[in-house]
């Protein structure tokens, strides 16, 4: 079942996020990671917020352990994310 993931990174910046994306070998508006179905990020008053849809929670958690955590630490994110999961009833993609 698809899962929605909301990650709030308090104190992180979009510049740090861009560095993480580079370390992952991803490019803006390019293809995402295997198992990831949709991804976007925005600046908040206190950091950044990432919103994703993944094939499953297990696929996301492996990706988070293998890439998000290590790369976020490497570029200096000051805090681990506050993460919320949501079961996805439906999603639509561009036509």
Regions found by a protein language model. Name each.
Residues 1-67, 76-95:
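Short S/T/G/P-rich N-terminal loop/turn motif that feeds into the first structured element of a domain
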């Amino acid at each position: 079942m698809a899962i929605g993931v909301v990650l709030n990174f308090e104190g992180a910046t979009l510049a740090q996020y861009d560095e993480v994306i580079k370390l992952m070998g991803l490019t803006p508006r390019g293809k995402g990671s295997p198992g990831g179905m949709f991804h976007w990020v925005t600046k908040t008053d206190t950091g950044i917020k990432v919103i994703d849809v993944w094939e499953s929670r297990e696929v996301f958690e492996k990706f988070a352990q293998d890439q998000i955590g290590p790369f976020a630490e490497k570029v200096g994110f000051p805090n681990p994310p506050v993460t919320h999961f949501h079961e996805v009833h439906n999603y639509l993609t561009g036509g």
